[in-house]
Each structure stands twice: as C-alpha cells, then as structure tokens.
C-alpha cells in the first residue's frame, strides 16, 4: 500500500511469475480483500455475537487485507456487516440453499413452533433463529421443495442429516 501525506495513494503489486513490481495509483483506493469470518480475534472485536455461530467460511477467511490496510492507517467502512445464513447444518457447517425458503420451506424451533417469515432477509431470519431455544431451527418442507432442490439429497440425505416422514406427526416424532 502506497501512503502519501497520511492517505492511501495506491498499491504496489508483485507479479510472482516474473518478479516485476507494478505500481497502481488512484485518487481513491478501495480495498476489497474478502472477509474475516474465520478470524476469532476480529469477530470478537467487530461482531462478538457471532463468535459461537456455526460458520460456512473457509479457514482462510482471516481478514489479512483488512489488517494490512488498517496497519497503514486506512479507514474501514461497514466492517460489522458480515453476511450470515440462517440455514446452516449445525454439526457440519453445510449450507442449506436459501432457495428452499423461497420455494416454501418453513423454519421451526426445537419446540416445533414457526418463529419468522422465512422470506425476510438473511440477517433478520438469522437473528430470529438465534433467539430460539438452542439458537437453531429445523427447515421443514414438502416433496415439491425436495424435488426442486437436488442439493438436499447430495448434501444432507446421503450423509444422514435429513429426516423424512409421510406426516407432520411422524416428522415431529423423529425430531424429539
């Protein structure tokens, strides 16, 4: 990062293939380097309520670009805006497609109660889910939703992470 008179004026980039350094200058520099969802220290600083959340982030999401920019005095904007997903399988971190909510799945808590409008934004649905007993929910849907979302079979059913029944009563009995 090139600093001039207390401001970011550009960056120097190294081409690993040939060792050539190129300088890029601009009147405004925006660093878009990825997130920090796997960096517990940064989560504790900016979003401590997410420290115990199950994450779908890959382990490399450490926020190094943000830390480098901050180290030279760059400002950060909206750093607390971390994308969260309400339909993450809790023991494996596998993400259940948001398409299932759009197709008609409902979320119920461990007591079998629906607690939100599933079509609200991710952050709103996630916040409602965290308020439930245990901070998680079941996604309940019919055969039509199942048939339209092939990832359910591949990611969940084959791994023994999905429950299935012919009636709601039968499904509820399995959830106990």
Regions from the language model: what does each represent?
Residues 2-23, 29:
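Conserved beta-strand-loop-beta-strand element in the redox core of flavoprotein oxidoreductases
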Residues 8, 30-33, 100-102:
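Short glycine/serine/threonine-biased micro-segments
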Residues 11, 35-38, 103-105, 113:
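Gly/Ser/Thr-rich helix-start
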Residues 20, 24-89, 94:
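Glycine-rich loop(s) and the adjacent beta-strand/alpha-helix scaffold that form part
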Residues 62, 66-68, 72-175:
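An anion/pyrophosphate-binding glycine-rich loop and adjacent beta-alpha core
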């Amino acid at each position: 990062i090139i600093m001039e008179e207390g401001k970011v004026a550009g960056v120097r980039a190294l081409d690993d293939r040939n060792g050539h350094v190129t300088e890029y200058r601009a009147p405004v520099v925006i660093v878009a380097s990825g997130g920090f969802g796997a960096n517990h220290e940064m989560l504790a600083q900016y979003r401590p309520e997410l420290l115990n959340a199950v994450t779908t982030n890959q382990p490399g999401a450490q926020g190094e670009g943000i830390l480098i920019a901050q180290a030279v005095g760059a400002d950060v904007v909206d750093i607390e805006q971390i994308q969260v997903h309400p339909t993450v399988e809790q023991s494996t971190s596998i993400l259940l497609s948001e398409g299932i909510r759009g197709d008609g799945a409902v979320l119920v808590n461990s007591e079998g109660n629906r607690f939100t409008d599933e079509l609200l934004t991710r952050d709103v649905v996630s916040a409602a889910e965290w308020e439930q007993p245990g901070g998680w929910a079941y996604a309940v849907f019919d055969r039509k939703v199942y048939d339209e979302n092939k990832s359910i079979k591949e990611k969940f059913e084959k791994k023994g992470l999905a429950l299935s029944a012919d009636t709601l009563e039968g499904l509820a009995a399995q959830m106990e």
